[in-house]
């Protein structure tokens, strides 16, 4: 052997090797290997996006108020086959019957308090980006109190809505008889989501999937929402990071005064009304290096889990909360884009 | 700082050396162990480093490096920055087929923190193949280890008639769109 090296093979550590405990990931979590993983389309985001536009004044903010300050779980939906927005009343009746049947399954005795579920479906024509987009559809389940049917006191227990804001990419080459409402937002018990989902799946031959938001897209949201003007003083911009490869979970919360964040963003952004990937990177890099200077922690090595700003807050598991009605359309536009890229 | 050069040392008899560079220690170590477990008819030395440049004080002990694999974890933006910074300490002659980028974590698109365009661009800018894998899965780790071994064999000149440059050109053609 040359140089008197021992025969055989060896691993050698070079320099300052960080020896992290190689804690295995919990198996079976978040493993979703679908889609063209190795293709060039994977994990790409467009070079630039438009800033979320402010809503026009003619749209009534009160109408959309019930969508605000609630946690919505995101799903992506493939196009609905033979769906007609004129038949919403019939659909509501059919869904009501279906839910009653599902609830009765396996029950020998009719538990009447449980079964009085009323289904309402309505259109939300305000929620769209352009005339091309189909009107959003709202589904609400409410519990009838069987004690006093005359009072007709109803308690809302579950709501979900389908929407499509500026889904031009998908709308252009959609085959006939299909309606594209790629984004589905749910607030309520998961059991109802499953029942409603399976009815839509059977009736319109569509497919639901949870829509997770990747840390990369969360950085986009952080930058986009920081750049938005908000009238009054709002909550701090907060970024939540989780540190991987640790035996115990460790979360780092990074809160920035919204005005400071806006000031930083204004120095980064070059063309008004438009955001590029590069600008998003520079913005996050600035925040990371500031944090590193104070705490000697590389936030870029951690996972961005949650972004909350005065506009909205988003969690990587696909949970969103809208806080400003005027930017509702803008936020939905980005979410629609993500939903479309998931189903394509 | 010391730039890593491919040809300033003599090769050792019947052996080949690979250098794995990446910020995440755990998966790299596992990959190295998987490579050692593979059956092979030559000796391999695996050197692990979290970043370049390599410390110069042990330079005289280090064998000639035949292949450098930069490991990028798409879940960590830091790993990409780290690799980008390390590339400055590699001699240009390495990029004639003796460098590859190993991108791990590709099964978890939902955890992606890195813009994929940046990784593709890295491969194009440095004329080096980009290999996608998931080092946290045993099956893919073993397959990746085999693949790297085969590349190492070529880069060390142990496959008659196939040079590192020739091989990387082949890889580029097959990876091209």
Swiss-Prot record, chain A:
It comes from the Eukaryota. InterPro entries: CENP-L (IPR025204). Keywords: Centromere, Chromosome, Nucleus. One of its GO terms (cellular component) is nucleus. The keyword Nucleus applies. Residues 1-32 are annotated as: Disordered. It is found in: Nucleus; Chromosome, Centromere. The keyword Nucleus applies. Residues 20-32 have a biased composition (Polar residues). Its main location: nucleus. Component of the CENPA-HI complex, at least composed of CENPH, CENPI, CENPK, CENPL, CENPM, CENPO and CENPP. Component of the CENPA-HI complex, a centromeric complex involved in assembly of kinetochore proteins, mitotic progression and chromosome segregation. Belongs to the CENP-L/IML3 family. This is Centromere protein L. It comes from Gallus gallus. The lineage of its organism: Eukaryota, Metazoa, Chordata, Craniata, Vertebrata.
From Swiss-Prot, chain B:
The keyword Nucleus applies. It is found in: Nucleus; Chromosome, Centromere. Its main location: nucleus. Keywords: Centromere, Chromosome, Nucleus. Pfam families: CENP-M (PF11111). Disulfide bonds: none annotated. GO terms for cellular component: chromosome, centromeric region; nucleus. It comes from the Eukaryota. Component of the CENPA-HI complex, a centromeric complex involved in assembly of kinetochore proteins, mitotic progression and chromosome segregation. Component of the CENPA-HI complex, at least composed of CENPH, CENPI, CENPK, CENPL, CENPM, CENPO and CENPP. PANTHER family: CENTROMERE PROTEIN M. This is Centromere protein M. The gene is CENPM.
